């Protein structure tokens, strides 16, 4: 449960970061990613409330995967390697 709380915080922090850093002209695609992430986080909370830690953790991993994908295809201008699989200053 402690790890789950850690990953909720990490993923929710990353989501907040991408919402503030959408690259101009890519808002529509970014919104799709953000919506999917929100859905998976919601699912994770649902599973957590049912004490289904495995599926809660899986949903969080999917959520974060969507964030990383959006960062990699440059929908978001992010460069925090603690939150994303990119660390690009350009």
Task: List where the protein language model places each region.
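Long, charged/polar, soluble alpha-helical segments
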Residues: 1-90
